């Protein structure tokens, strides 16, 4: 019997896949547990429609991420921080500070998407990697300046 998996099943496959299983396994376990549904013509068409909608949605997100990446690539963020006379910071500039500075510039990015090569502990120019989508990332220039 052909079924459409609704959940990931370790021995069969991932959600959304159409697999062929024995009638008893489908009728007595997979379907009652909500792990699968019968692969009727209507269900297969609905699955195909859902996949197309999902692909469209992912493409829209990718286009939006590329637009944000272009905007970020051209920016130079200025992050103020308290520093001593030698240029050493009192504390560090982290991804949270960079995310806050981006938010001020009108770009809302989750701090966990920002990657620094090393913690920023001195005044100067640095670069940070911002992962915006599965295959879209941007490098942003960060200038750490003395406060006040």
Swiss-Prot record:
Q: Name one GO cellular component term.
A: ribosome
Q: Keywords in alphabetical order, please.
A: Ribonucleoprotein, Ribosomal protein, RNA-binding, rRNA-binding
The record's listing under InterPro entries reads: Ribosomal_bL9, Ribosomal_bL9/RNase_H1_N, Ribosomal_bL9_bac/chp, Ribosomal_bL9_C, Ribosomal_bL9_C_sf, Ribosomal_bL9_N, Ribosomal_bL9_N_sf
Pfam families, from UniProt? Ribosomal_L9_C, Ribosomal_L9_N
Which GO biological process annotations does it have? Answer: translation
The stretch of residues making up the signal peptide is none
**One function term, GO molecular function aspect:** rRNA binding
Regarding protein family, the annotation reads: Belongs to the bacterial ribosomal protein bL9 family.
What does this chain do? Binds to the 23S rRNA.
Q: What is this protein called?
A: Large ribosomal subunit protein bL9
In its UniProt entry, the species of origin is given as: Prosthecochloris aestuarii (strain DSM 271 / SK 413)
Taxonomy of origin reads: Bacteria, Pseudomonadati, Chlorobiota, Chlorobiia, Chlorobiales
Q: Which gene encodes it?
A: rplI
